[in-house]
Amino acid sequence: MSERSQIRRHPERSVPDEAPTILAEGLVAHVGFCHRGQPFVIPFSYHYDESDPDKIYLHGSVASRALQFLGDGGPVCISVTLLDGLVYSRSAKYHSMNYRSAVVFGSARVVSEEEKKAVIFDKMVDRYFAGRTAGRDYEAAPSAHLNNTLVVEVVIDESSAKARTGGPAGPTDAIDGAPGTCGIVDLRNLG
């Protein structure tokens, strides 16, 4: 772990070993990069497989400025957050959220091999729509689609992860009969 991935605020919430699980469970990656002195953060769907834990794959149009820049080997920072619960407190300051988040730093390259792009496409479909099989449940991506899509492989250099769990921590939250309400709305099992 270097200074850039060190958790400074609430270091006791550091859970570095959970980064792969967070990346595997997440649905949206916020991809940060700096291009010509201008910082950008763009949301992407992505593919991450815990059996190949040093890589994340992003895909989009060949016209994507973000993917073009990243594909040239630019440095990248990716953040994935899982919101597990809303924490209500009797005090405004102590309202909070239970979450798990991972931040990764790395560099990227364009995946130009058509066969590898096709495999990544199929894995992404299965990741977001489990159980669907190319050729049975949907038409596999033809060469024309693969040629119009840019796939970028991000090699992870380092990562950090942080989690907050538990209930409210306000000064009156543990006092029975204090005014107001407090508790947790669990968001993990909705839907």
Where are these regions (language model features)?
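Short hydrophobic-aromatic micro-motifs
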Residues: I56-H59, I78, A102-V104, V152-E153, ...
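A structural signal for short, well-ordered beta-strand segments
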Residues: Y46, G106-A108, V152-I156
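C-terminal edge-of-domain segments
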Residues: S112-G191
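Short connector loops at helix/strand junctions that flank enzyme active sites
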Residues: A24-G26, P39-V41, S51-P53, G71-P75, ...
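Short Pro/Gly-enriched beta-strand edge/turn motifs at strand-loop
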Residues: R13-V15, E25-H30, A134-R136
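Short beta-strand segments
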Residues: G26-V62, I78, Y88-Y94
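Short, structured beta-strand-loop surface elements
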Residues: V62-I120
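Extreme N-terminal tail/first-helix region
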Residues: M1-A24, P179-G180
